[in-house]
Amino acid sequence: MPRRRYGATYDIRHYSSEKENKMHTLRSHIFVAGLLAFAVVNGNAQKPATGWTDYVGGPDSSHFSPLKQITPANVSKLDVAWTFPAGDGFYSSSPLVIDNIAYVAAKHGALVALDAATGKELWSHPFASSGGRAGISQQRGMNYWESKDRSDRRILVTTGGYLYAINALTGKDVDSFSDHGKLDLKTGIDRAPIALASRTPGRTFENLIILGSFTGEGYLAPPGDIRAFDVHTGKLVWIFHTIPRPGEMGYDSWPKDAYKYMGGVDVWGEFTIDVKRGIVYFPVASAKYELYGADRHGNNLYADSLLALDARTGKYLWHFQTVHHDVWDYDPNQAPQLATVRHNGKMVDVVALPSKNGFLYVFDRVTGKPLWPIEERPVPQSDLPGEKTSPTQPFPTVVPPFARQNMTVNDLYTGFMTPEEVVWWKERLSKAKSGLFTPPGLTETIQIPGVTGGASFFGSGADAAKGMVFVESKNVPSILKMVPDGESISTNNGGLIPSRIDAHPQPNPRAAGAASLPARLGRTIYEQTCQVCHGPDLKGDRGPALDTVVSRLGPDGVRKVIHNGRGAMPPFPSIPSQGVSDVIAFLKQPDLAPPGSAVAGNTLTEHIEPDYPANLVPKPPRYKTGYGQEGYIITPPWSTITAYNLNTGKIMWQTPYGDTPQAGPSDTLRGNVFPRSGFVILASGLVVFVDNQSKLYALDQKTGKVLFTRDAPNGAVGVPAVYEVGGREYILFALTGGPAFSAGLRMAPGGVNTPAGPKSYVAFALPVTK
């Protein structure tokens, strides 16, 4: 590939915004007396508002509030104003506040409306357990839309393969929307599976609801086409093919007819809208399978790209690909951030994209031209059979990375390890390959940032007027080793006990006839498909624990969840009935299939993935690996928040994102290992968050200095909401995180465990003065 300075293509128009809305009449008898007047933020200038109408702060995804009552001078007085119990289960949804009503996910995944001043329940909208409608507890947020005259107000949520429209005042389904209030997320997708998931609610723009999707992680996943629907009717308005069709730009960056069988290239994270210009910016994810690409030779547009489209029509404007032919799962997913900066003596509107590889890419918002040069540099090549990686990758030349991009034996953190483990890990790391763009192979590779980032969901924001962008990120390595598809994959996935993660292929498994065979086959599917989220011991990791799921839901309930998806979990329709039965056997009696007992063979391969089209000859080989997350083996900080001044391209400060007290006493913060929460930026000069160790932090926006900490009832997930009711400013957190420390991992000497408190929504505010 020739050396180039930037990779954008230009096809730009300027737009003015004028909404066109149908008027609908709804009863508002439930609306409580004394509602405050509310101005919806409709643009990227952050205008004063009293609510939080978007789960990441606004169409610009800034996490920014213009409210100034809570300041650096008084934040130490912050206290609990009210609490509302969320109920059992794992919750990851961010709240909304419109006027003085807070909307949260609670009570077994119901949509619940609360009085935002008191936390008193106004109404709830439960989701039935049948038909894939399993509740919104694990969705990352909700969407709000209103007509010009505010007579029609809707909450839009996704769950179980559907988008639902709910009356924001009454909690009733909007019967005129699509099929009696619900829209099938497969609509418009040619190669749709049984069900298609979305972990985010999309974004509203004028009379449109724009949606991404989550297609799953396997070979031959469905495509991640971007779609926009009429918010009144649910009718499909436009679609953009992220895997191009013949005649579309980027088609030649794939093998011929790749759109017929390749998948992924989805938008599973947050995206951003420049309302004034009518431009929507998407962080587009990697192609699937994301860690091996013999079936997708080429650069694979628009995978791993920042993609700008006309929000009204879906017309292509420009793109920049951050990773060519991704085999590291380095897809961007944090929301692109909008800011206005002084550059070369002129004011420039920019868009900045944090990525999982640790780089921040900054562009002119209109033209797509990089603000500073981005160079193509040679990188190591893959030695896997059939693989053809890109000879170069793009590197920003001015803006420093926000995450660590290399790890050696010298970076080994031994605080959690026994002397035996220290020796074992040093030997293991000394033999492994490393490097930011070193492809995974048949021997172990240390990848940092690992496959979960770097930058991941919920973790970026901006003070646009100051040209400041804030990025939350993780320093979590992955240790990857590819094995042929069908062989067993086993990873420590956060544990430290030496497990020798080599593959253990077993011949002809079903012929063995052992009583434990279904559970062992189920473990194999679990390790390849479920373990990254639910942990190697079923105790939960990024997802909920599954050690009691069969007794709670019953075999039929588990089968339904696997096929339909539930909350943040996508559906897995490619696993046929026998494979699902094997998984249920393992979940029911995991003692029959202890670690290392997973088996493989032709039957397993048939269980997990479909085959390629019959006319694809020769069929490419397949390799797989686990995610290999090893968060506790690298020296801290394990996560950080980084503040950039984009007027200069320099880092202003970097501060650990919370702490991990299980690592023992420390005079400095070390960050959380797997934070699941986001921060908010207050116009008064604060950055505020609750970490996964039940601690609230308030940072000085200018310096990153910790100004105040206090205990919180539980660890946080999602992005808090900042709002004002009756002249009082509140910060509402979803404190529903549960235990944050990896199950089964011993504490360091002097370490203190953080018990999980009650799952609840907690609003903090300053005391009422008399």
Question: Where does each model-flagged region fall?
Answer:
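Repeat-blade elements of multi-bladed beta-propeller folds
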Residues: 52-56, 88-110, 134-162, 194-219, ...
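N-terminal pre-domain segments of enzymes
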Residues: 45-69, 390-419, 426, 597-621
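Extracytoplasmic/lumenal domain signature
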Residues: 73-84, 111-132, 149, 163-193, ...
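Mature N-terminal segment immediately following signal peptide/propeptide cleavage
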Residues: 46-87, 91-97, 642-644
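Short, Lys/Arg-enriched N-terminal segments with co-localized hydrophobic residues
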Residues: 9-22
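Bacterial N-terminal signal peptides that target proteins for export
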Residues: 21-31
